[in-house]
Structures are given as C-alpha cells and as structure tokens.
C-alpha cells in the first residue's frame, strides 16, 4: 500500500466535502421553510423565485449592489470552537473590585432550569397574561423580595442596571418636585458609573448635578432630589437620617442606591425615610458577565405608582373570580403616553429578575441572611488581620467592602503580588485600595490576601489570633450596631417552602408550564421578531471565560472580549453601512436614547445647540417620542397618508418651518406599518438639506440585512435590537441589547465610560455613559456573534428574504378573511403585515381582545394588538417558522373568522360565544354545570392539532380594570389562591 496515494479522487472528495458542508450548515437549521416549501409559497404569491419577490418588495434604489463582506459561514461546532479560542484569551482572576459587581454562586438548579431553559428565555413580555402566569408569578416574587428588603411599598419588575435605575429615580424626583429647583445632589460616595450616567441623563434636561459630601452639604441651594449609596462605594455605612430629614424639609425626594444583600442585615432605606430605593440584584446568583445582563430594581412609595418606570406586575382576578396576575397600570407606559411618558424603558431584565427571585426563593430569608453574615464575618476578619499588619481601615462600620490605606507600603508592590496570584483589587489612588468580599470568598482567600499585604519581614498569624482581634472589636459587627435590621422580611410562604432542589425543580416546572414560549408555538408579534434562539448561540453565555470577568478588570485580562467586540462591531458596521458602532446601550430604548444624544452632541459641538426639534411620524413606536423628550428635544409630529406612509409634503413643510431648529428625524424602516416606503432617500435628503440628522429606528432591521443598509439609505444613526434581528432571546421581557451604528462624522460622540477607556477617539467629545457597564450586557453579545458567524453573508441574506416571504405568504392566505391594511406599491408587505379587524366590532360586537384570547384556545400567542393602528393585529412570522406552522396559524385565524361569521348571521349568541368567553381553561370545562350554547369540544379543541398537543391557559380572561382599581404588586396570602 502506498501511503501517500489519494484515497479518493479529487472530484469525489469535493462532492463529499460539499455534502458534509450542507449537513453541517447552520442556515437551513435556522430558516424554517425548506426549498420545496419556499417554492410552494412563492407559487401562492405568483413569483418564480425569491429574488423576484424581493425585487418587487424592496425599492431598487436602495438595494445592495454587492454581497455583504463577512467571513464564510461556519458550522455550529466550528463556530463554537472558534469562539472557544477567543474565550481562552480572557483571564479569569479573583476580583475583589466590587463597585456594584460581585462574584456569586448560581445554584445549578436555577442555571439549568431557567438560564439554560428555552421555556423561560424564549417567551415574550407578558402582555397576554393568561398564557404568562408562570413568569408573572416569578416577577411578583421579585417585586415582593424588593419591597421586603427595601422597606418600601411598591416595586417594579426590574430595570436595566443600577445606574439607569438611579437616573430613572432622578427623573421621577424631578417630575414630582414642587420647589421649582433644577439641581440634584449626588453623593460622591456613589459608584462612579452611577454618577456618570446621572450626569449624562441630566445634561439634556437642564438638570444641574451637584456631586458632593452629604455630611457637609448645607442645603443653602435648592435641590429637587438626592441620591445616596448604601453602603457607600468605599464600603462605609452612613447614618443618612439627618440628611434625609433636611432634604424633605426643603421639598426634595431622596433616593438610596442599596445593595439588596446587605439589607438582610442593615436597616432598610424605607425605615430611615428614603422615598426611592434602587440597586442591582446581580449578587443574587447572576454571573458577573463582564457587566451584564443583571436585573436592577426600583422601589418607592405607592403615591408614585403611576410614575414608576418599566413594568409592574399586579394582582387581579379572572372571569371565574380567581386571583390572576397581569401587567398593571399599563397606561403610564411609553408606548401609550409617548412624548408625555416619564421614561422610555421598554425591555428590562425579566430573565435575570426571575433568576434573582428564585435565588431568594431557594435560599429563603434565613439562607440569604446566612450568606450575608458569612460575607460580613469574613470582612471583619479581613479588617482585623489587615489592622494587625499595620494598615488603616477607613470605615468604622462596613458590610463587605474595605478601603485600605496603604501608608508607607508601595501600591506597585501590592499590585505585583496580586498579579502573581491572579487577584484584582480596586485602586482608589496611589495610597489606597479597595477589597470587596463576596459569596464565593473563603478563609483560604483571606490567607492569600494577608500574604499579599504582609511586609517581607513581618510575621503572619493564625486565625485564632484574628478571632481574638475580632472578639475585641465586636462593636464593629453590624449586628451590634445602630444599623442592624430589626424588621422581618420574606415571610411569605413562597420564600419558606422550596428549599430542597426537588421542591424548587417542581416549582420552576410548574411555573414554566403556565407560559407559552417558542417551545410551544410561533409567537407572531409584529415589530418583535420572535425568531429562533439556537442552542449553539446560547451555550457560550454560560462559559466561565465570559461569565466570571469583572467589568472593570484590567484590559490585559479581557483580550478575548476585546477580540469579540472588535469582530462584532466590524460585522455590524458592514451589515449597516456605518463607520462606527457602540455596544454600550443595553436595550433598544437605550440605543434610541444614545443615538439621539450623539446627534445632540454633534450639533452642540458645531455651535448649533439651538437645534432641538425632532420630527417623528405619527406612526412611530412610543419609545421614539419618549426618547426624544429625554434628550431635551421638542417633538413635532409628521403626518402619514392613507397608506400609512410618511406624508412627504407634510415632512417638507415641517422641515422648512423648523429649519433653524431642526435636530433630527426619527424614522423606522421598513415603516412601523410593515412597508418599504419608496421615497425613503428623498425623506433623508429633505432632513439633511435643513441641517438635521436622520435617526433610523432599527426595530425592523430583520427586513434589511443583506438587502439594503441604513447607512446607504441616508441614515446618520441607527440602533439595532440584537434581541430581535440578531437572536438574543427576549427572555420574557429582557435582556436585550441596543447598540448603535453611526456615520463617520458622529463617531467622536459615541458613549464613553468613567472607569474603562472604551474608545480613545471619543474621550474628549463623547456623550458620557448611557449604561453602568462599558459594553452593556457584554456576556450576551456572544449570542449575536455566534449567529452571524454561523449564518455568513449568504445565510443572513437568505434569512431576510424568507422573513419577507413568510409575511407575504400569511398576508396572501388571510386577505380574503381580514383586509391587509397597508401594502407597498406592488401590493406586497415587508417582514410583517397588519390585518384590519375594526369592522368586526360593528358586524359582530367582537373586540380585538376577543380574537387575541381565542387564539390561545388554538395554542397561539396573539400578534401585536391595536398597534400601530387601533383595532388591528400586526403579524411578524420571522424566517424561523416553517410553512407548516404558518399554515396552522393561518388556519386558526380563518377558523376564528368563521366563528365570527356565525355571530354575524345570528346563528350564535353575540355575548355567550367561544370568543367572548375565551380563553377556556381546563378547570372551566369540568367545574360545575356547562351552561354555554356551544360544546366543551368547541371551546377547548377547535382545531385538529390541539388534540395532538394542547396548551392550556392557566387562568380565564383577566379583569384588567379591577387590577388597576385594586392595585397590589406583592405576593398575595396563600389563602387567596385557595378561595
């Protein structure tokens, strides 16, 4: 046998390689319809090919002339291997940096059954509460946790990060202030990233930030509010009572940014007079993740309930009178109040809030207190030992963090010793370092720290000696101080029942089974892009090389992350046609805000700070005007024509009228009505001719990738919802990521950061930080990296084409039953379509909600209801749904239309019918005498597929008005559920 002879002929080898590549290709796994399905769907639409469909859908003037320049697509396994090599370049050090970020232990039962479970992470925001009771209960637990720990009356269902929560608290304080002040006091003991985000948020609103010492602030100057850190960033615990009393006497509200774990030992903010409490629940089992995602919290007094940002879960009742949960007080949210909204927050951090709540459920009040006491005792030990070694500890009272004055010791020597042992400390200055103890710290870690801080000629000591020192310093223990907590917390049974893994596992499964996620069926929400979140994309999120990195770790330890960011930024720049990308905004709402701030800073830098008018089409999503107002801009509405397109004549008139003051136009493309507007380039040119900039909302980017690019169309800024187009899961309402792309002239103004240099070119003119962490929720960026790496240019482009195909297929199949409200000039839609149900109210007294709830009986989540047009539903199938699933969904809507027809002709009672009584629970079918004029079978099994697998709504239709009139946002007593 000749060893170097080819085993296969070259052509045979090529064929085998091609077959192997086809088998391992990710794109066909991601895209639902196969080639045969695509041809059948095209036949229904009357097109010979996908390209022919796209040619008639997307204006030729904006089409890409050449394919995207991206790396060749890799298989799932090859991409994971490539990312693993990048991850290996990160160095996982033991970080004692603190500053709001701490290592923690994620209970494995929570990691496996929530974080890694698509039943939890693929769900959408619970706007259809009857099929989201599990998530809503977990979030109610979260709110109860926060209410109990902070000692305040109400809490929301999470915010993006602690710094953003503090900024939202400032906005609330400003909104309710009656003393006409425009100054806000910020303690210099707050975390630096919080101070910077507050300064960023304050500037466009004309708020003057006063950073100072709360102990010496004399209140001669009027302030509308203040924020204090508890414990302080350097670990000190202050008695804030006197300051708060003085602030209240001057009509100011006081916010306390508090570590929730410390509140198991410390007097809660609500008990010493705080009006608002904010903070991060990261140390409740959420990995560091180089900055996120983590769930922040926001608690306040009930009198401010209609001003609270984000979402609040409230208790109501269903049609059978049983307790049921829903999102409460929705009329205060940005999608309804628009420019009058007090916040633009939309997506928050639901998945992480669920994890944090279950961490508290699993450990219970005693377990949480034990964790906190262990941390505190180790910190006391550390302080005693360092004092024994001759160091000064700055604080008399502390929880987990020490500021260590080095005295004559060299900082450089200390840091060299730390480097040798893979340890990070916080560096205050040349004379002091910070050490924060956390849940993972052990006695062995303390020995290592003592060895680092011991002088070469000093003698180390045993733990008995440290114990003696601690015994002599018992007064420093929080339990023996005036700061000790005396009130009970987490007394509800949910926090005292599920402490074994068996019990928690079953509880998690019970909640998960109440929720409809992508594991059940398609979620056809328009403008939400509920596409596949592939397992290969999700796996790297849990790798320690990404999860155990502190956001303020030295750059030398984060080379893997830097490569990831550079590659992802380059890919997104190519996809969008922009010169620069910022990955910092940690939600779409924050991307909008950051993009508009960049435009504002650009005008200001050119001496045109007077430009403050933002033109926004009347069809825009509510976050657009809310974001514009937050940036200090005046919103001027631009009319839309009868086809839902921007009225170009009205745009020209408004641009002309406000030419001197014009700052920007906010435009969504394709439009919020699901159409590629033909004159988009003319629209951009009009704005530019009057000195304005064009901000493109990237919510509908799933219809652009590989076909056209915002930068080529004429946009100057565009935010990208990575949790839509680029496969980060919605998590039931977060996490999300909203990076922005900008044209070259705007690159210098991209967000900066006070702790970490993120772009040298922007440090002098940047807008400041818009999120607490330098790269936002950095650890989930691996998901989008994996998606692009596995799809490649061809796969991404094909996905866009199929998304457009799927939407048009649905529109075509349903147009005979429900009018398609808006279409392009060739009778086609983009990636979503609006079905008009308004006539049904007159013909059959059927409301939009009746159809939405009836879809649950068919096993589907409703499309987006009554937006962007009241009385309509907007359907976005995405490219991931198969033809079979699309057909099932269409069949469900057709069957519902036939049910409505029976009402219209008088065959069925107009009030007692399958729609008005939907959704039907299993309990409603078997309890008591059946008194409806239709059968149980019609109610529960209206379609063949429901017999194969039936998803049961957990509750009947919920009484929304009752819940708002009787506002309760914490756990009900257990007897309420049995009554």
UniProtKB/Swiss-Prot annotation:
Class in the EC hierarchy, top level: oxidoreductase
Keyword Oxidoreductase: yes
UniProt KW Oxidoreductase keyword: yes
Gene Ontology BP terms: glycine decarboxylation via glycine cleavage system
GO cellular component terms given for this protein: cytosol; glycine cleavage complex
Keywords: Oxidoreductase, Pyridoxal phosphate
InterPro entries the UniProt entry points to: GcvP (IPR003437), GDC-P_C (IPR049316), GDC-P_N (IPR049315), GDC_P (IPR020581), PyrdxlP-dep_Trfase (IPR015424), PyrdxlP-dep_Trfase_major (IPR015421), PyrdxlP-dep_Trfase_small (IPR015422)
Gene3D superfamilies with a match to the protein in the record: Aspartate Aminotransferase, domain 1, Type I PLP-dependent aspartate aminotransferase-like (Major domain)
GO MF annotation terms: glycine binding; glycine dehydrogenase (decarboxylating) activity; pyridoxal phosphate binding
Cofactor names: pyridoxal 5'-phosphate
Catalysed reactions listed for this entry: N(6)-[(R)-lipoyl]-L-lysyl-[glycine-cleavage complex H protein] + glycine + H(+) = N(6)-[(R)-S(8)-aminomethyldihydrolipoyl]-L-lysyl-[glycine-cleavage complex H protein] + CO2
Membership in a protein family: Belongs to the GcvP family.
Function (record text): The glycine cleavage system catalyzes the degradation of glycine. The P protein binds the alpha-amino group of glycine through its pyridoxal phosphate cofactor; CO(2) is released and the remaining methylamine moiety is then transferred to the lipoamide cofactor of the H protein.
Assembly description: The glycine cleavage system is composed of four proteins: P, T, L and H.
HAMAP family in alphabetical order: GcvP (MF_00711)
Name assigned to this protein: Glycine dehydrogenase (decarboxylating)
Organism: Nostoc punctiforme (strain ATCC 29133 / PCC 73102)
Lineage: Bacteria, Bacillati, Cyanobacteriota, Cyanophyceae, Nostocales
């Amino acid at each position: 046998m000749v060893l170097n002879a080819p085993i296969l002929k070259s052509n045979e080898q090529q064929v085998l390689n091609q077959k192997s590549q086809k088998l391992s290709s990710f794109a066909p796994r991601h895209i639902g319809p196969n080639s045969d399905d695509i041809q059948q769907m095209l036949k229904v639409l009357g097109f010979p090919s996908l390209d022919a469909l796209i040619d008639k859908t997307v204006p030729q003037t904006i089409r890409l002339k050449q394919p995207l320049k991206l790396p060749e697509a890799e298989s799932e396994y090859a991409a994971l291997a490539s990312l693993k090599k990048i991850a290996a370049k990160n160095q996982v050090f033991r970080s004692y940096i603190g500053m709001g970020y701490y290592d923690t232990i994620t209970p494995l039962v929570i990691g496996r059954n929530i974080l890694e479970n698509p039943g939890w992470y693929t769900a959408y925001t619970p706007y259809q509460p009857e099929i989201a009771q599990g998530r809503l209960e977990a979030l109610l637990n979260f709110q109860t946790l926060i209410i109990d720990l902070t000692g305040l009356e109400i809490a929301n269902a999470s915010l993006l990060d602690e710094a953003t929560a503090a900024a939202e608290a400032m906005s609330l304080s400003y909104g309710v202030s009656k003393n006409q002040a425009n100054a806000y006091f910020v303690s210099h003991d707050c975390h630096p990233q919080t101070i910077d985000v507050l300064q960023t948020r304050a500037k466009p609103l004309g708020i003057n930030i006063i950073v100072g010492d709360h102990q010496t602030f004399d209140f001669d100057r009027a302030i509308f509010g203040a924020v204090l850190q508890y414990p302080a960033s350097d670990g000190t615990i202050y008695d804030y009572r006197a300051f708060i009393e003085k602030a209240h006497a001057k009509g100011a509200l006081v916010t306390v940014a508090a570590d929730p774990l410390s509140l198991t030992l410390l007097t809660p903010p609500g008990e010493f007079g705080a009006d608002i409490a904010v903070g991060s629940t990261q140390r409740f089992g959420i990995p560091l993740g180089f900055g996120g995602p983590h769930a922040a919290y926001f608690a306040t007094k009930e009198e401010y309930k209609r001003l609270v940002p984000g979402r609040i879960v409230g208790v109501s009742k269903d049609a059978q009178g049983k307790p049921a949960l829903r999102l409460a007080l929705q009329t205060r949210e940005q999608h309804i109040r628009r420019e009058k909204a007090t916040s633009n927050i939309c997506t928050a951090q639901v998945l992480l809030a669920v994890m944090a709540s279950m961490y508290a459920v699993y450990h219970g009040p005693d377990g949480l207190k034990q964790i906190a006491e262990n941390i505190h005792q180790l910190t006391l030990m550390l302080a005693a030992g360092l004092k024994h070694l001759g160091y000064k500890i700055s604080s008399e009272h502390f929880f987990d963090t020490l500021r260590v004055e080095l005295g004559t010791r060299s900082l450089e020597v200390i840091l060299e010793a730390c480097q040798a042992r893979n340890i990070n400390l916080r560096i205050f200055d040349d004379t002091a370092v910070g050490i924060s103890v956390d849940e993972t710290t052990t006695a062995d870690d303390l020995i290592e720290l003592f060895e680092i801080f011991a002088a070469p000629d000093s003698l180390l000591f045993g733990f008995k000696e440290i114990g003696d020192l601690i015994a002599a310093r018992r007064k420093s223990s929080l339990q023996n101080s005036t700061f000790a907590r005396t009130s009970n917390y987490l007394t509800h049974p949910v926090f005292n029942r599920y402490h074994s893994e068996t019990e928690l596992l079953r509880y998690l499964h019970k909640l998960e089974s109440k929720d409809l996620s992508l594991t059940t069926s398609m979620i056809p929400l328009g403008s939400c892009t509920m596409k596949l979140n592939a397992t290969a994309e999700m796996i790297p999120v849990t790798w320690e090389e990404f999860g155990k990195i502190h956001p303020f770790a030295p750059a030398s330890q984060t080379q893997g992350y830097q490569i990831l960011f550079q590659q992802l930024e380059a890919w997104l720049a190519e996809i969008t046609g922009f010169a620069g990308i910022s990955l910092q905004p940690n939600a779409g709402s924050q991307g909008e805000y950051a993009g508009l701030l960049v435009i504002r800073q650009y005008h200001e830098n050119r001496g045109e700070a007077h430009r403050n008018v933002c033109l926004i089409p009347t069809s825009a999503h509510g976050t657009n005007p809310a974001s514009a107002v937050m940036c200090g801009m005046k919103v001027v509405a631009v009319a839309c024509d009868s086809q839902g397109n921007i009225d170009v004549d009205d745009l020209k008139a408004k641009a002309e009228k406000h030419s001197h003051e014009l700052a920007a136009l906010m435009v969504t493309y394709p439009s919020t009505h699901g159409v590629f507007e033909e004159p988009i380039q003319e629209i951009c040119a009009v704005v530019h001719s009057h000195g304005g900039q064009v901000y493109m909302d990237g919510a509908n980017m799933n219809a652009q990738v590989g076909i056209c690019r915002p930068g080529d169309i004429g946009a100057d800024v565009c935010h990208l919802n990575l949790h839509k187009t680029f496969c980060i899961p919605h998590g039931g309402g977060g996490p999300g990521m909203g990076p922005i792309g900008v044209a070259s002239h705007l690159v210098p103004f991209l967000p900066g950061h006070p702790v970490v240099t993120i772009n040298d070119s922007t440090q002098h003119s940047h807008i400041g930080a818009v999120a607490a962490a330098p790269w936002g929720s950095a650890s989930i960026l691996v998901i989008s990296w994996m998606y692009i790496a596995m799809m490649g240019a061809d796969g991404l482009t094909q996905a866009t084409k199929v998304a457009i195909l799927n939407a048009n297929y649905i529109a075509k199949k349903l147009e005979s039953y429900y009018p398609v409200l808006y279409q392009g000039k060739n009778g086609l839609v983009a990636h979503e379509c609006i079905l008009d149900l308004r006539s049904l109210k007159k013909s059959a007294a059927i409301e939009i909600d009746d159809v939405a709830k009836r879809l649950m009986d068919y096993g589907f989540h409703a499309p987006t209801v009554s937006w962007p047009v009241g009385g309509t539903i907007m359907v976005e199938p995405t490219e991931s749904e198969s033809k079979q699933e699309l057909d099932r969904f269409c069949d469900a809507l057709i069957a519902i239309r036939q049910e409505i027809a029976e009402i219209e002709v008088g065959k069925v009672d107009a009030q007692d019918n399958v729609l008005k009584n939907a959704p039907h629970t299993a309990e409603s079918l078997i309890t008591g005498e059946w008194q409806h004029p239709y059968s149980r079978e019609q109610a529960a099994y209206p379609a063949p597929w429901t017999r194969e697998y039936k998803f049961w709504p957990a509750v009947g239709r919920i009484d929304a008005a009752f819940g708002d009139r009787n506002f309760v946002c914490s756990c009900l007593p257990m007897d309420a559920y049995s009554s």
